[in-house]
Amino acid sequence: MNLRTAAELLRSGQMRVLLGAMRLVTPYYRLLWLVAAFRSGLIARLEGGARSFEELARDRVQDAADRDWLRAWLELGVRVGQLRLEGERYSLRSYLARQLARPANDAIAAILEEVATLHYRLVLESPTRMAAGRRFTLADQDGVLVARSSPLLRPFVHEAIDEVVP
């Protein structure tokens, strides 16, 4: 942002609002990028160590014209702190990304995917659906995803049952 733009935002009183809004954007992009990287197999691919752009492009880009698109998407991963780029090699940077690469943490990956896909719809669409009288149904859920995430919730369900059932 140049000085003139910053000055205009300050004069209009919007700078503080903009900064507050931007604090929400990065974690949201971080979540979406992490889920997309997991779904696409990138996290599993990088679990074994750093890979060059060429190695990643080989199995992720069918049309050579999309190589810049992949590079921009990988750069987003770097910017949101999930990837590291050293030289020309990408690796997993964050603790969370490295841990999601482990099969034992699939339920946690599924919870994140559920939040990024289903929960976002529940939150975003609820007011409109209520106004139209259109409830969510089981068909709005991804059963496989819910099944993948459910082992993580099992101890909480057991705890709730233990509190209610003698």
Which residue ranges define each predicted feature?
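Long, low-complexity, charged/polar intrinsically disordered regions in eukaryotic proteins
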Residues: 1-26
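Short acidic, hydrophobic short linear motifs in intrinsically disordered regions
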Residues: 49-60
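Short, basic interhelical loop/turn and adjoining N-cap
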Residues: 63-67
